[in-house]
Structures are given as structure tokens and as C-alpha cells.
């Protein structure tokens, strides 16, 4: 007879703690924050992936703040507007006027990679590049928050009442590109973002091996299901870490021309096939391989591809069926009836698979249709894809089950596209929040909008549900504009260029970098020195002799440029 097994109390305690934590996670998930989120895993899965040492993350407090900010804008029909910040100077200036901060992968790729090797936005930099920039800015936010608190607590109540308080702790949303590889790469990337201070992360549905800036050509999508896996990986990692990090799903389906796979039926209606029967058995890839074998390259291969594509008569399966129905030897009324029946069943929201489409077409009399989506595949094996707002809507429906915001990348600031996408996505997921890239890649002056319409663009699409809007590269362009124009003028006019363009403008606009020693925190660290040394320090940085005292005075400036001899100009005291 087998001996009975007595479960040690330690094992029971371990299980008890595990079950209690599972219950905590289930309660957390049932909160208002996650009422729209659907997870394909359980709370037990999450807790099993956690360690015993419970950790808290400052980014989680920022994530909660971001969520409150965005939901408030959504409720009010307004938008959080922001742009890509390059450095601590920009992030502290932005804090006075904007309620969120963006960290752009493009800007990091061109100005601040982990290897210091700049380049275009191809997501080929080390995957800690953007998290490192997030940490750079998040540390700066926290530092300037501490510095401000020390300064304010050194003031009298009357002085504090007259001194505006700046909330430097604005939530950061960061560019996660495509997740940088497979599931484990996405998991580790998201872990870095949480640890480095990101309140939100966006991940796009391009192929990670061919990723391009959203406004470059040659974009290749992954299947809907593959991008859902990326989003699930991100959400799972946030859950394991116990954070409410805001997840933004971006789709490049509007302008994409290729897709990696036809495995997901939701993509089938947008994949293009050959309808020219004379190309049966003559795939483009084999034709190009033959051309290379005989020594063709470059322009010659491009000519072969162009000629083949021009004769292929590429179209979606649905368009091919409609064309076949219209060619049938039937009365016009019967043709119209069958076309309408096809279009009714093949509506984009039904997401018919190709197999289902062929069955339906056969019932309508289209039994010998030649349509082949394998023949036009590229040399890399990609399928041809007909990008559109409709394709983006279909993806938006799928991604909204996991993500908190949906972002459709566009080629121009098209109000009709914005409306179509918003109405399409919200027809099935009415409470989802939307994001919009107010891209500097758009030639806004060529958009056909008046200045008034440009000014109204943000609030107008905010009313459609785009509650987070951002100029990805405004920090980069602002930096370039200021430095280029100043350098040009400085080369010509010397110090007068600096005084007129920089110093006086800082003074008149109340920009706190005018007193750059104070901005950098010299007073703050003097407080450390004095605290350590009993309240006094002979080596304080802001003591007697610091040149920044000049900016606290009111003075007269004789011989001002453009004024008569003997005149002077009174310059107002700087705003410190």
C-alpha cells in the first residue's frame, strides 16, 4: 500500500500566494481601464511569468496619467497635441504648453542611436535606441521637477503665488517600430520601455525585416494575425510587469503595396492576382531568375518586371468576379442582380476568404475564372497588396481588441480619409481612441488647405475621435531651422546676430534658458552643497561672481543699432 503524501505547509503557502495574486490580476483586469481589452491568455498565465519580488515602475504612474489625459480629450472631443522631442531642452520647453511627449524612432535613427551611427528610418538600429532616448528625457523630466520643487520651497508664499507651476512630468509615448523581431524581441523591447519611463508605446504592422518610414515606398505588411501576436506580446509583458502602459497599434495598410503572407483570411480581399490566362505557369519570380541567369541586371531586370506587370491585369479577386459577371451572356438585369448579390456577400466587413469567395462565385455562375495570386509574387516571395483606407479599417477592428489606440498612417492630410477611417473603425468598436500623425512629410502648403483650415485641422479631426495627434519630427525640424538661420546670420553679423536672434528673444518670450546656469540646476546642487556643509559653502556655483547676476538687473544700452547718436534703450529685467 502506497504511503500517503503530506503536503508541506510551505507548498500550501506558495499556492495560496499564487492564487491570491491571480485574484488580484483578475480584479485589475475587470476595472474600467481594461473594459475594452480582450486577452487570449489568463491571469494564471501572467502570474506564472512573474517573479516573487514585486516591483513598481514610475512609468506606470505616467501611464495612468496618460490614460486619464486621453480619455478626457476623447470625452470632450479634443486632442492631446504634441511632437517628437529631441533632447532635455525641448522636453522642458514643451512641458509648459503640451500635455504629452512623443519620442520618434525616425529622430533617434538620424540623431541618437545606441551605436552613434546615424541613418534613415529603417529600424536597423539597436533595439535599445529608442528606450535609451526615453530614459534620457524621462530623467530630465524628473530632474527639472525636483529642481522646480526646491526652487519653489525656497520662495515665500507670495512669491510662489506669482510664479507659475510647470508640470514637467508629461507622459511619454514612444516609437516601438515593428517590435524588432519575433515575440521574445517584442517582449524584451516592451520591458525596456517600461523600465526606461515610457507611458505608452506604438507598434506597427510592417514586416520587421523590410520596415520603412511610413512615408517611404516599398512597405511590406505582415498578416493581421502576426501583428495581433505582436500586440498580445506587448500587452502580456505589460501585464507581467503590472503596468497600465498605453498600447497604440499603427497600420500602414493605406499605402502598402506588398504583404508577407496570405495566411490570414482577413487579408485575402486586398491581395492582387493575375487575370491574364496567357501568363499561366509563367511567374514573375521565375522570369526574373531566368533574366539574371543570362546576365541581366538593374534596368534590364526592371524592364522585364514592368512589362510582365503591365500584361498581368492585376486585380483583387472581388474585382475579377465582377468583371467576369459583366462578361456573361445574360440580360443586363440578370447581370446587375448577380453583381449586386456578389457585392452584398463580398462586402469588406465580411472578410471572405478566397476559398469562400470562389464557392460564392461558382454559385453565381463564375466557374472558370482565372485568378492567381502566386504568379505576381516578388523575388522575395511577397504578395501584391492593394492598400486602402478600407484595408486599414479591417485591421483597425482586429487590433482594437488588444490595443488602446489605433493609428492609420496616411500619405497626406486628407480629411475624407480621416473621416472614412474613423467612421469605419467606430462602426464596430465605437469606444476605441484614435491617433493621427500630423506628419512633416506632408507638404502642407500643397494640401489645398487655407491657413484657417490648417489651424482648424487638429480640432476638426479631434471631433472624429483622434484624441492623440502629433508631429513626429517637429523637434528635428525646429532644431534645424533655428541653427541653420542663426549660423548663417552669425557668420555675417557676429555677436549682434546672437543677441538679436537668441538672447533678446529669450528675454522677451520669457524662455528660462536665458539664465542657463539656473536652468541646468546650479542652484539645486548648491542646495546639496550647503546642506552637506551645514548651510554654507564657499564653493557654491551660484555665489558671488556668477555672471548670471547680469540678467537680474535693469540696465540701459547705449548706441542701440538703428538709433540716433547719444540715445539709449532701457532693457527690461529678465524673467528668471
Swiss-Prot record:
Q: Where is this motif: Microbody targeting signal?
A: 574-576
Q: In which pathway does it act?
A: Carbohydrate metabolism; glyoxylate cycle; (S)-malate from isocitrate: step 1/2
Please state where this protein is localized: Glyoxysome
Show the taxonomic lineage.
Answer: Eukaryota, Viridiplantae, Streptophyta, Embryophyta, Tracheophyta
What quaternary arrangement does the UniProt entry report?
Homotetramer.
Q: Name one GO molecular function term.
A: metal ion binding
Q: What class of enzyme is it?
A: lyase
| Biological process according to GO | glyoxylate cycle; tricarboxylic acid cycle
Protein name, per record:
Isocitrate lyase
Natural source organism:
Brassica napus (Rape)
Concerning its family, UniProt says: Belongs to the isocitrate lyase/PEP mutase superfamily. Isocitrate lyase family.
Entry keywords, A to Z = Glyoxylate bypass, Glyoxysome, Lyase, Magnesium, Metal-binding, Peroxisome, Tricarboxylic acid cycle
Amino acid at each position: 500500500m502506497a504511503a500517503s503524501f503530506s503536503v508541506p505547509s510551505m507548498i500550501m503557502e506558495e499556492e495560496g500566494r499564487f492564487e491570491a495574486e491571480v485574484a488580484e490580476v483578475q480584479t485589475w483586469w475587470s476595472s474600467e481601464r481594461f473594459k475594452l481589452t480582450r486577452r487570449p491568455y489568463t491571469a494564471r498565465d501572467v502570474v506564472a511569468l512573474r517573479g516573487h519580488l514585486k516591483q513598481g515602475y514610475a512609468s506606470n504612474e505616467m501611464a495612468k496619467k496618460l490614460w486619464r489625459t486621453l480619455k478626457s480629450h476623447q470625452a470632450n472631443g479634443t486632442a492631446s497635441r504634441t511632437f517628437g522631442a529631441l533632447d532635455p531642452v525641448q522636453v522642458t520647453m514643451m512641458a509648459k504648453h503640451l500635455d504629452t511627449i512623443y519620442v520618434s524612432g525616425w529622430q533617434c535613427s538620424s540623431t541618437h542611436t545606441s551605436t552613434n551611427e546615424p541613418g534613415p528610418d529603417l529600424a536597423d538600429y539597436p533595439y535599445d535606441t529608442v528606450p535609451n532616448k526615453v530614459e534620457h528625457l524621462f530623467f530630465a523630466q524628473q530632474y527639472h521637477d525636483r529642481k522646480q520643487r526646491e526652487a519653489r520651497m525656497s520662495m515665500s508664499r507670495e512669491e510662489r503665488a506669482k510664479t507659475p507651476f510647470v508640470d514637467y512630468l508629461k507622459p511619454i509615448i514612444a516609437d516601438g517600430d515593428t517590435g524588432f523581431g519575433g515575440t521574445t524581441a517584442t517582449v524584451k523591447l516592451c520591458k525596456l520601455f517600461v523600465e526606461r519611463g515610457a507611458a505608452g508605446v506604438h507598434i506597427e504592422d510592417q514586416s520587421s525585416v523590410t520596415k520603412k518610414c511610413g512615408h517611404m515606398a516599398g512597405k511590406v505588411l505582415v498578416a493581421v494575425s502576426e501583428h495581433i501576436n505582436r500586440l498580445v506580446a506587448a500587452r502580456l509583458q505589460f501585464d507581467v510587469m503590472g503596468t497600465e502602459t498605453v498600447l497604440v497599434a499603427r497600420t500602414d495598410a493605406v499605402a502598402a503595396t506588398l504583404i508577407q503572407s496570405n495566411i490570414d483570411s482577413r487579408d485575402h480581399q486586398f491581395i492582387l492576382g493575375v487575370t491574364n490566362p496567357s501568363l499561366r505557369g509563367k511567374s514573375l519570380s521565375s522570369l526574373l531568375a531566368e533574366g539574371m541567369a543570362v546576365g541581366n541586371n538593374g534596368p534590364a531586370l526592371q524592364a522585364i518586371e514592368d512589362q510582365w506587370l503591365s500584361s498581368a491585369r492585376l486585380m483583387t479577386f472581388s474585382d475579377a468576379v465582377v468583371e467576369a459577371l459583366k462578361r456573361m451572356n445574360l440580360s443586363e438585369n440578370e447581370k446587375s442582380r448577380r453583381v449586386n448579390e456578389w457585392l452584398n456577400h463580398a462586402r469588406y466587413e465580411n472578410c471572405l476568404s478566397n476559398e469562400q469567395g470562389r464557392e460564392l462565385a461558382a454559385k453565381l455562375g463564375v466557374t472558370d475564372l482565372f485568378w492567381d495570386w502566386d504568379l505576381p509574387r516578388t523575388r522575395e516571395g511577397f504578395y501584391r497588396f492593394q492598400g486602402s483606407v478600407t484595408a486599414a479599417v479591417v485591421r483597425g477592428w482586429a487590433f482594437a481588441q488588444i490595443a488602446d489606440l489605433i493609428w492609420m498612417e496616411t500619405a497626406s492630410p486628407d480629411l475624407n480619409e480621416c473621416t472614412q477611417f474613423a467612421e469605419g473603425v467606430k462602426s464596430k468598436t465605437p469606444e476605441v481612441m484614435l491617433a493621427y500623425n500630423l506628419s512633416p512629410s506632408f507638404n502642407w502648403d500643397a494640401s489645398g488647405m487655407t491657413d484657417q483650415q490648417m489651424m482648424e485641422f487638429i480640432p476638426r479631426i479631434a471631433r472624429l475621435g483622434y484624441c492623440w495627434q502629433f508631429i513626429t519630427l517637429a523637434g528635428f525640424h525646429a532644431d534645424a531651422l533655428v541653427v541653420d538661420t542663426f549660423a548663417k546670420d552669425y557668420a555675417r553679423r557676429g555677436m549682434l546676430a546672437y543677441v538679436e536672434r537668441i538672447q533678446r528673444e529669450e528675454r522677451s518670450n520669457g524662455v528660462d534658458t536665458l539664465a542657463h546656469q539656473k536652468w541646468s540646476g546650479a542652484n539645486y546642487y548648491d542646495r546639496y552643497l550647503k546642506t552637506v556643509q551645514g548651510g554654507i559653502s564657499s564653493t557654491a556655483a551660484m555665489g558671488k561672481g556668477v555672471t548670471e547676476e547680469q540678467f537680474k538687473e535693469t540696465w540701459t544700452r547705449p548706441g542701440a543699432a538703428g538709433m540716433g547718436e547719444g540715445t539709449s534703450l532701457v532693457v527690461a529685467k529678465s524673467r528668471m
